[in-house]
C-alpha cells in the first residue's frame, strides 16, 4: 500500500508538471500571437504620436487667432500630428484692409497668440513644439557684441625698418598676442616665431623678410538668419555659458511661459550654422585647464599648420571647442527643457565643432538631408539614437524639395521620405507649413527655401493618404530594436587636427573622409550601417555591432583603441587604407607607440584578429567573410534599399526602390525565422497572408519609388487586410484587360456649366484658357463590364507608368526630386460608382477597385490635382521693394524667375484589368 501511494503521488506530480508545461506553452503561444497581432493592429491603425509634424512658419509674425484655429483644424483633418512653431520674417507690410498686422516678436500680443495656438492644438490632440528663437541660429537683440559668436582674427603686418605698428581694432576686438616671424603673411615659418609687445614698437631685426602676427579675439558679426520683426540681432556665442544663459532668460523663458500648464512637447534648436566661429573669451583658460598647456605660445603653429606638432595643437583646440559647446550650449538647453517639463530636440551638427558623442546630450536627436549613400547629418543623428537608446529619431524633411516653392509633388515627398526611413528616421518633421491668411491671396505665402504643404496647395486633398503612409511606416520603424550590422568609426580626431581658423566643423570634415563609395559598397553588399566615434566607444566600453570598419585614420585615443582591440575577440574589425598610429593631441603623443603596436597586433601579426584591406573594392568580400548579408539580392537591384528592425518574435524589413526604374529581384533574408508576410505600407493591406521561407528567396518587383514591408516571423498568421479580407499575391498571376479607358472622358473645370468631351488624354494646359490653371479637374466616364467577374479575382484601374528622365541639374543643386514624369500629374482621387476607391500619388499608378466594380454599367470619376506653379506662372512676380525698405533684405525667393506652366492632368494609357490568382 505504501508503494502504491508513492507511485500515485509521483504520477500526480508528473501530471502537474505536464499541466504546467502545457499551460506555459499555451501562454507563450498566446504571447507570440498577441505580439504578432499587436504589430499588425498597429500597422493597420498606427497611434497618433507617429503622425508627421510640420514646421509652422509664422511670417511677420502677422497671425490672428481665427486663422491659427483654422489652420490647426485643417492640419488635424489632414493627418498631421503636430506643429513646430517658428516665427520668421515678414512677407507683407501692415495692411488693415487685408487683415495684416506684423506683431513684434515676444510682444504681449505675440505671446498671447502662442498661448492660444498651444491651447487650440492640444484640444485637437496635436503636439506642439517651439523653436527657442526666431529664425536661426539662436541670437537676437539681447545678444550684445560681447556675447556674440567669436572668432580668432589674425592681422599680418609687415615689419618695416625694425618697427611694427599694431593694427586698428574694431569695436569689441581684443588683442591676445603678437609674434614676429620670418617670411611673408602667406608663407611664414612658425618655428621662428618670437613674441613681441602687443602695442608694437621696435622688434629685433632678422635676416630677410619679417612679418608681425597680431592674434585678435574678434567676432563673426553674423546676425540671425530670417528673423521676425523685433528678433534681429547678433548670433550668440555657442561656446559661452553667459551667452546662452542670457538667451534662455530673455527669449526662451517668455516663450515657454506662454504655454502655461501645458508645456511644449519639445523645445528646438535648428541646425547650428554659426559660420566661422572658433573662439570665445574663456578659451585660453579653458584650454590650459583641459589640455594641460598654454595655447597662446602655439598660435603661430595653429595658424600655419604643416607639422605634426601643429596638427596636434589644432586637435587640442578643436577638442576644447567641442567640450565648450557641449557644456555651455547643449547641456544648459537640455537642463532648461527638463526644468520646464519639456525635452530638447536638436540638430547637433554643422558649425561649430560638435562631435557624434555630443548627440548624447539632447533627448531628441534630429537629422536633415536624404543623402542615403554618402555621409549624412541624418545618419549621424540616427546613429546617436541607436547608440544612446533613443527610440525616436526625427528629421527635418523636404527642405528645398523640388525647388521652387509649390513645385514639389506627393511623389517627390515619398522619394525623399523613404530615404529618410532608410537612414533610420521614424519621426517626420515636414519643412513645412506656411501660415497664410486670406489677405495673402493665392496661392499664399511660402518660405524662400521650402516646399508648401498647406491647404493652398492644389493637391492637398490627398494629404490624408500621404500622412497615413508616413504615420504607418514611422510607427513600424519604432518597433523592436535597430538591426544595423556595421559601424563606421568616424575619424573625428583627424578632423579636429585638420581644423583651421574659421573652419571648425567635424561634420564638414567627415564629408571628405567618409567617401560615398564606401557607403555605397556597404549598402550594396546587403548591410545597413551606423556611425560611431571614439568617445562613444570609450563611454559604452564596447561596440554594439558585429562589424567595425576603421576608414583611413591616423589618430585615436589610446583608451578607445584598447577597447577596440578587446572587442576584436568577438567582433570583426576591418581597417581600410591606413590603421591608426598616433595619439590625438600634443600631450598624448607619448601614446603613439602603443597605438601603433595595437594596429600591428590587430592587422599585421601572424595571429591578428582584424582584417586590413587597401581599397573600397575589397569591402564587400571582407564583409561577406565577416557575416552573411542581412538582405542578399540578385537581379535588377539598382536603387534598392532596406532597413531592418528586430523584435522578439519577428523581423521587420522596410524595402524601398529609391530609383526611377523597376526593381525585379530575388531577395533572401538572413533571419532564420520560418514564415513571412508581405505588407503594403500605403494601403495598410497584408498582401501575402503568409508563406514558409525555404532558403530559395522571395521574388520582389517594385515600381519606381515603391516600398514594401516584409515581416519575417516565427509563426504563420492569418492574412487579413484592412477591409477584413484575405489578400494573396502570386508571381505568375497575369492581367487580363476588361476595357481600354484611354479615351472617351469628360472633363469639368470649376465654374464651367457643363463638362467638355476629351478625345485624347494629355495636359489640360493645352486646352483653351487653361494654361495657367491650378486646382482640381474632374474626369469622368462610364465603363461597361459585359461578363460576370471571377470570384476572388482582383479588378484594378491601371493609369500607366509614366516616363523617366535624368537629373540634369548641377551636381550641387539644392533639394531632391523624383526623376519620373508620372501618368497622373500630380495626384488624384478615384471614385467608382460614387464610392471613394483610393488615391493616386506615387507608383504604381493602379487602384484595386474589386469591391466597387460590378457587372454592367459603372461610373468612374477621377479628381485630378496639379501644383500651384501654373497659377504662379500666370501672375506677375511679387514686388518686395517696399517690404525691404522697411525690414531690409531678409530673404530672396529661390528659383522663381521665368516660371512656366507644368503639364497637368491624366496622360494614360488607362485600362480596367482583371487579375486571377492561379
Descriptions of predicted regions:
Residues 4-22:
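Bacterial N-terminal signal peptides that target proteins for export
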Residues 21-30:
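Bacterial N-terminal signal peptides
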Residues 39-82:
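Mature N-terminal segment immediately following signal peptide/propeptide cleavage
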Residues 52-53, 64, 68-69, 82, ...:
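Carbohydrate-binding surfaces of carbohydrate-active enzymes
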Residues 88-198, 205-207, 214-225, 229-236:
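Acidic/aromatic-lined carbohydrate-recognition and catalytic surfaces
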Residues 136-146, 150-153, 158-165, 169-192, ...:
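An acidic-aromatic loop/edge-strand motif
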Residues 177-180, 184-256, 691-738, 855-857:
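Extended acidic/polar, glycine-enriched regions
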Residues 831-838:
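Short strand-turn-strand beta-turns centered on an Asx-Gly dipeptide
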